[in-house]
């Protein structure tokens, strides 16, 4: 985890193996559950996610590549997010992650 990745109000539940690429940016009041990976995809270290405010990242979720996650998104346990989620306040689940609830 790199310095300056997180804004204020971060909550980590069930911590343990949480991987965050130092180039990732995570907004205010986000929640991360254990065994998550927030990082680059395909060996391109500068290609890392930008995550909005109030995002909830479920257990074992992976957010990969130079994508954007909008404010208020809920990412389900085990989801793999490889494309931007630009609609705020939705729930995404699955492999690959898809919107199931607005």
Report each predicted region and the residues it spans.
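Left-handed beta-helix
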Residues: 2-3, 8-9, 13-22, 27-28, ...
């Amino acid at each position: 985890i790199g310095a300056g990745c997180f804004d204020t109000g971060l909550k980590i539940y069930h911590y343990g193996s949480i991987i965050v690429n130092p180039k990732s940016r995570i907004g205010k009041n986000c929640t991360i559950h254990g065994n998550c990976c927030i990082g680059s995809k395909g060996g391109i270290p500068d290609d890392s996610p930008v995550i909005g405010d109030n995002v909830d990242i479920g257990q074992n979720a992976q957010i990969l590549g130079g994508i954007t996650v909008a404010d208020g998104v809920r990412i389900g346990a085990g989801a793999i997010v490889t494309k931007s989620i630009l609609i705020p306040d939705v729930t995404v689940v699955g492999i690959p992650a898809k919107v199931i609830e607005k």
